[in-house]
């Protein structure tokens, strides 16, 4: 069976130019380089947003739109809006905006749960921001319920 990464890779066009975009190292959980990814990962994939989110959910994943408050590399910067009913589980904002301000800046997205995270690109930045979530236990099912605001589970935005 094909994994979601393979489905997306089929729709990515081109090879990476290391001189222009840098090396795309494949790194394991110990920080060891296991290989180099030759695909051009910075490019667009020929897949619709709703199809991508459907695939994520087919694999029991959670779909979170990353740093929607950034002026580049976010769904809002690319599309200009998030269509009502787009099946994101949550929306992430940077610590610079924060959860309280996100509710003010994006009132049209009130039906989504917001989270914030470090969006770390460097080891030293991991854990510099976090989101507190009310759950009974740390499982994916509980996290999904929290994002959906079900059975008392929720993101704590204060």
Residue ranges and their predicted role:
Residues 1-90, 97, 107, 142:
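Extended substrate/RNA-proximal surfaces in nucleic-acid metabolism proteins
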Residues 112-128:
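Short acidic/histidine-rich active-site segments
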Residues 103-109:
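Short, aromatic/basic amphipathic alpha-helical patches
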Residues 73-81, 103, 124-137:
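Histidine/acidic-residue-rich catalytic or RNA/ligand-binding cores of hydrolases
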Residues 68, 95, 118-120:
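Active-site metal-binding loops of divalent metal-dependent hydrolases
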Residues 85-90, 109-113, 130-134:
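Glycine-enriched alpha-helix->loop->beta-strand junction motifs that scaffold or abut catalytic
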Residues 137-158:
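Mid-to-C-terminal alpha-helical segments outside catalytic/metal-binding sites
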């Amino acid at each position: 069976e094909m994994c979601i990464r393979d489905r997306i890779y089929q729709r990515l066009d081109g090879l990476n130019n290391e001189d222009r975009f840098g090396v795309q190292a494949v790194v394991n959980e110990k920080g060891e380089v296991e290989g180099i990814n030759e695909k051009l990962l910075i490019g667009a994939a020929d897949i619709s947003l709703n199809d991508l989110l459907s695939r994520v959910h087919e694999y029991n994943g959670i779909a979170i739109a990353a740093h929607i408050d950034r002026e580049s590399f976010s769904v809002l910067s690319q599309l200009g809006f998030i269509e009502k009913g787009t099946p994101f589980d949550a929306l992430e904002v940077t610590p610079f905006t924060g959860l309280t301000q996100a509710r003010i800046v994006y009132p049209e997205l009130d039906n989504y749960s917001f989270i914030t995270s470090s969006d770390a690109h460097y080891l030293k930045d991991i854990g510099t921001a976090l989101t507190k979530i009310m759950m009974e236990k740390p499982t994916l099912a509980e996290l999904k319920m929290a994002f959906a605001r079900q059975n008392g589970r929720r993101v704590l935005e204060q």
